[in-house]
Protein backbone atom coordinates (compact mmCIF):
# COMPACT_ATOMS: atom_id res chain seq x y z
CA UNK A 1 0.00 0.00 0.00
CA UNK A 2 1.29 3.44 -0.85
CA UNK A 3 0.70 6.15 1.71
CA UNK A 4 1.30 9.88 1.84
CA UNK A 5 3.79 11.33 4.33
CA UNK A 6 0.81 12.18 6.59
CA UNK A 7 -0.24 8.50 6.66
CA UNK A 8 -3.30 8.75 4.40
CA UNK A 9 -3.75 6.17 1.65
CA UNK A 10 -2.90 7.11 -1.92
CA UNK A 11 -5.70 5.66 -4.04
CA UNK A 12 -3.47 4.09 -6.66
CA UNK A 13 -5.44 0.93 -7.48
CA UNK A 14 -7.42 1.85 -10.55
CA UNK A 15 -9.44 0.60 -13.45
CA UNK A 16 -7.91 0.92 -16.90
CA UNK A 17 -8.90 4.51 -17.75
CA UNK A 18 -11.01 5.85 -20.56
CA UNK A 19 -10.23 9.33 -21.90
CA UNK A 20 -13.39 10.46 -20.10
CA UNK A 21 -12.12 9.10 -16.75
CA UNK A 22 -8.89 11.03 -17.02
CA UNK A 23 -10.53 14.25 -18.22
CA UNK A 24 -13.07 14.21 -15.37
CA UNK A 25 -10.43 13.36 -12.80
CA UNK A 26 -8.09 16.10 -13.97
CA UNK A 27 -10.40 19.00 -14.76
CA UNK A 28 -13.58 18.71 -12.68
CA UNK A 29 -13.63 19.57 -8.98
CA UNK A 30 -13.75 16.65 -6.54
CA UNK A 31 -17.19 17.75 -5.37
CA UNK A 32 -18.55 16.99 -8.85
CA UNK A 33 -16.58 13.87 -9.75
CA UNK A 34 -16.54 11.97 -6.44
CA UNK A 35 -18.84 9.16 -7.62
CA UNK A 36 -16.77 8.53 -10.76
CA UNK A 37 -13.50 8.71 -8.82
CA UNK A 38 -14.78 6.24 -6.23
CA UNK A 39 -15.37 3.64 -8.93
CA UNK A 40 -12.26 4.44 -10.99
CA UNK A 41 -10.00 4.35 -7.90
CA UNK A 42 -11.74 1.27 -6.46
CA UNK A 43 -12.63 2.92 -3.14
CA UNK A 44 -15.22 0.24 -2.37
CA UNK A 45 -12.42 -2.32 -2.09
CA UNK A 46 -11.38 -0.69 1.17
CA UNK A 47 -7.73 -1.06 0.13
CA UNK A 48 -7.51 -3.69 2.87
CA UNK A 49 -7.33 -6.98 0.96
CA UNK A 50 -5.24 -8.69 -1.66
CA UNK A 51 -7.00 -8.10 -4.97
CA UNK A 52 -6.62 -8.14 -8.73
CA UNK A 53 -6.11 -4.61 -10.10
CA UNK A 54 -5.52 -3.89 -13.80
CA UNK A 55 -3.77 -0.53 -13.30
CA UNK A 56 -1.27 -0.09 -10.52
CA UNK A 57 0.95 2.94 -10.01
CA UNK A 58 4.52 2.72 -11.20
CA UNK A 59 5.77 4.42 -8.04
CA UNK A 60 6.06 1.03 -6.29
CA UNK A 61 5.75 -2.35 -7.97
CA UNK A 62 7.41 -5.74 -8.03
CA UNK A 63 7.46 -7.69 -11.28
CA UNK A 64 8.62 -11.18 -12.14
CA UNK A 65 11.52 -10.95 -14.57
CA UNK A 66 10.11 -13.79 -16.68
CA UNK A 67 6.78 -11.98 -17.00
CA UNK A 68 8.49 -8.69 -17.81
CA UNK A 69 10.56 -10.38 -20.51
CA UNK A 70 7.38 -11.81 -22.01
CA UNK A 71 5.25 -8.63 -22.04
CA UNK A 72 8.12 -6.19 -22.58
CA UNK A 73 9.49 -3.21 -20.73
CA UNK A 74 8.00 0.26 -20.45
CA UNK A 75 6.90 1.60 -23.84
CA UNK A 76 9.43 4.27 -24.77
CA UNK A 77 6.86 6.18 -26.84
CA UNK A 78 5.47 7.68 -23.64
CA UNK A 79 8.14 8.16 -21.03
CA UNK A 80 6.06 9.91 -18.42
CA UNK A 81 2.56 9.37 -17.02
CA UNK A 82 0.80 6.60 -18.96
CA UNK A 83 3.81 4.25 -18.93
CA UNK A 84 2.56 2.50 -15.79
CA UNK A 85 -0.97 2.19 -17.21
CA UNK A 86 0.45 0.54 -20.31
CA UNK A 87 2.79 -1.84 -18.46
CA UNK A 88 0.32 -3.02 -15.83
CA UNK A 89 -2.36 -3.39 -18.48
CA UNK A 90 -0.09 -5.61 -20.59
CA UNK A 91 0.80 -7.61 -17.47
CA UNK A 92 -2.87 -7.93 -16.43
CA UNK A 93 -3.74 -9.36 -19.84
CA UNK A 94 -1.43 -12.35 -19.23
CA UNK A 95 -0.85 -12.48 -15.49
CA UNK A 96 -2.50 -11.43 -12.26
CA UNK A 97 -1.60 -7.88 -11.30
CA UNK A 98 -2.19 -7.85 -7.59
CA UNK A 99 -2.42 -5.23 -4.86
CA UNK A 100 -0.92 -6.31 -1.50
CA UNK A 101 -2.04 -4.09 1.39
CA UNK A 102 0.33 -5.72 3.90
CA UNK A 103 3.38 -3.90 2.57
CA UNK A 104 3.47 -0.14 3.06
CA UNK A 105 5.69 2.48 1.47
CA UNK A 106 5.58 6.25 1.79
CA UNK A 107 5.49 8.21 -1.45
CA UNK A 108 5.45 11.97 -1.75
CA UNK A 109 3.26 12.48 -4.80
CA UNK A 110 4.66 15.35 -6.81
CA UNK A 111 1.68 15.95 -9.13
CA UNK A 112 3.90 17.95 -11.47
CA UNK A 113 1.25 18.17 -14.19
CA UNK A 114 -1.01 20.01 -11.74
CA UNK A 115 1.70 22.60 -11.04
CA UNK A 116 3.29 23.22 -14.43
CA UNK A 117 1.74 23.92 -17.81
CA UNK A 118 4.74 22.30 -19.48
CA UNK A 119 4.23 19.09 -17.49
CA UNK A 120 0.49 19.19 -18.23
CA UNK A 121 1.38 19.36 -21.94
CA UNK A 122 3.79 16.40 -21.55
CA UNK A 123 1.07 14.47 -19.71
CA UNK A 124 -1.58 15.22 -22.37
CA UNK A 125 0.81 14.50 -25.25
CA UNK A 126 1.75 11.10 -23.81
CA UNK A 127 -1.87 10.22 -23.07
CA UNK A 128 -2.68 10.89 -26.73
CA UNK A 129 0.05 8.39 -27.67
CA UNK A 130 -1.31 5.89 -25.15
CA UNK A 131 -4.90 6.13 -26.45
CA UNK A 132 -3.67 6.01 -30.05
CA UNK A 133 -2.01 2.70 -29.14
CA UNK A 134 -4.94 1.11 -27.30
CA UNK A 135 -8.04 2.89 -28.58
CA UNK A 136 -9.91 5.96 -27.50
CA UNK A 137 -13.49 4.85 -27.11
CA UNK A 138 -13.70 1.29 -28.43
CA UNK A 139 -11.23 -0.76 -26.43
CA UNK A 140 -12.36 -4.32 -25.74
CA UNK A 141 -9.26 -5.09 -23.68
CA UNK A 142 -9.98 -2.20 -21.32
CA UNK A 143 -13.63 -3.18 -21.09
CA UNK A 144 -12.78 -6.81 -20.29
CA UNK A 145 -10.17 -5.99 -17.63
CA UNK A 146 -12.46 -3.47 -15.94
CA UNK A 147 -15.42 -5.86 -15.97
CA UNK A 148 -13.25 -8.60 -14.48
CA UNK A 149 -12.07 -6.27 -11.72
CA UNK A 150 -15.51 -4.95 -10.80
CA UNK A 151 -17.00 -8.43 -10.90
CA UNK A 152 -14.34 -9.81 -8.57
CA UNK A 153 -14.82 -6.92 -6.16
CA UNK A 154 -18.61 -7.32 -6.21
CA UNK A 155 -18.25 -11.02 -5.42
CA UNK A 156 -15.76 -10.26 -2.65
CA UNK A 157 -13.15 -12.41 -4.36
CA UNK A 158 -9.59 -12.00 -3.28
CA UNK A 159 -6.50 -13.27 -5.00
Describe the predicted segments one by one.
Residues 1-15:
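Conserved donor NDP-sugar-binding/catalytic core segment of glycosyltransferases
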Residues 12, 22, 26, 70-71, ...:
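Residues that scaffold the ATP/ADP-binding catalytic core of kinase and kinase-like folds
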Residues 13-19, 115-118:
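Short, hinge-like loop/turn segments at secondary-structure boundaries
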Residues 17-53:
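Short, flexible, basic/aromatic active-site loop/helix in glycosyltransferases
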Residues 38-62, 146-159:
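Short linear elements at protein peripheries
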Residues 51-52, 59-61, 65-79, 85-106:
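Catalytic donor-sugar/metal-binding loop of nucleotide-sugar-dependent glycosyltransferases
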Residues 86-89, 93-159:
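Active-site-adjacent helix/loop segment of glycosyltransferases
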Amino acid sequence: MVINPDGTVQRLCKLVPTPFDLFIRRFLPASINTHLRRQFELWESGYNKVMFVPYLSGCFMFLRCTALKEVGLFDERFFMYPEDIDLTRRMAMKYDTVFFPNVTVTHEHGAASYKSLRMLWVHAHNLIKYFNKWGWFFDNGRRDLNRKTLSMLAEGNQK
